[in-house]
């Protein structure tokens, strides 16, 4: 039985509203033909974020070379080449939106020799050239385990280096067949050990994991010197995606938060609608970003 089609609990019902910035944000992003993870990944927080004039920019197109079963982003083996004007367009959007903190992410581009890392670098530099005061969070893919490609992005010294483990290792074959749990942990640890970046990761719950497995993964992240963690409810994007196994209660999310804090994470967000880039600017505003 597809549990996602059961009645959702009250805590998962959103009141949709649009503020004064919503239409302006939508018009700006559409006019520049920019991709956002908000729209491409069917994020439940799109209304809230766009209404506040914030968005997470998605680099390298809107089509991914991976087939993760939880993700709403379109898939193909051979996407179109990256738009060479995209870095400048994003920089212009950041300036137009008067952002103080910008989150960049991307699809996986296993079809490109550098995994898209050169495009990442161009985007970071374009943003900083036009917006020298802005802080940048990079939510990166694993670059297929090619260290040189990941290093190219880390060398740009983003204020936050984010890479999501997404789920517990036992679910990787079913949920993330082309990814590797240990490889993701190694990327996070390298960002801290070699480049001294503030590190972040996130995971979804409700896909069939146990509480003990979540606790173990939180421990693995801390052992890999991850500073910030986000935990949110998995929601099935379409009938073709992985079904929801169960709805995690707010009390359980609070327990996960307490567990993470006890392990020493410097900042924790845990709740049904938490996503990796949700309220990301708060981490910077609260001065959690330090080179250590």
Swiss-Prot record:
NCBIfam families reported in the protein's UniProt record: lipA (TIGR00510), PRK05481.1 (NF004019), PRK12928.1 (NF009544)
Q: What is this protein called?
A: Lipoyl synthase
Q: Which family does it belong to?
A: Belongs to the radical SAM superfamily. Lipoyl synthase family.
User: Which cellular compartments is it found in?
Assistant: Cytoplasm
What is its cofactor? [4Fe-4S] cluster
Assign the protein's first listed, main location to one coarse class. cytoplasm
| Keyword Iron-sulfur recorded | yes
Question: What does the UniProt cofactor note say?
Answer: Binds 2 [4Fe-4S] clusters per subunit. One cluster is coordinated with 3 cysteines and an exchangeable S-adenosyl-L-methionine.
**InterPro entries in the record, alphabetically?**
Aldolase_TIM (IPR013785), Elp3/MiaA/NifB-like_rSAM (IPR006638), Lipoyl_synth (IPR003698), rSAM (IPR007197)
Task: Quote the pathway field.
Answer: Protein modification; protein lipoylation via endogenous pathway; protein N(6)-(lipoyl)lysine from octanoyl-[acyl-carrier-protein]: step 2/2
In this chain the Radical SAM core domain maps to 50-266
Q: Which GO terms describe its cellular component?
A: cytoplasm
Among the Pfam families in the record, one is Radical_SAM
EC number, UniProt record: 2.8.1.8
Alphabetic keyword roster: 4Fe-4S, Cytoplasm, Iron, Iron-sulfur, Metal-binding, S-adenosyl-L-methionine, Transferase
Does 4Fe-4S count among this protein's keywords?
A: yes
Question: Which GO molecular function terms does the record list?
Answer: 4 iron, 4 sulfur cluster binding; lipoate synthase activity; metal ion binding
In the UniProt record, the gene name given for this protein reads: lipA
The record lists the catalysed reaction(s) as: [[Fe-S] cluster scaffold protein carrying a second [4Fe-4S](2+) cluster] + N(6)-octanoyl-L-lysyl-[protein] + 2 oxidized [2Fe-2S]-[ferredoxin] + 2 S-adenosyl-L-methionine + 4 H(+) = [[Fe-S] cluster scaffold protein] + N(6)-[(R)-dihydrolipoyl]-L-lysyl-[protein] + 4 Fe(3+) + 2 hydrogen sulfide + 2 5'-deoxyadenosine + 2 L-methionine + 2 reduced [2Fe-2S]-[ferredoxin]
The organism's lineage is:
Bacteria, Pseudomonadati, Chlorobiota, Chlorobiia, Chlorobiales
The entry marks the following residues as binding [4Fe-4S] cluster 2, namely: 64, 68, 71
Which residues does the annotation say bind [4Fe-4S] cluster 1?
38, 43, 49, 277
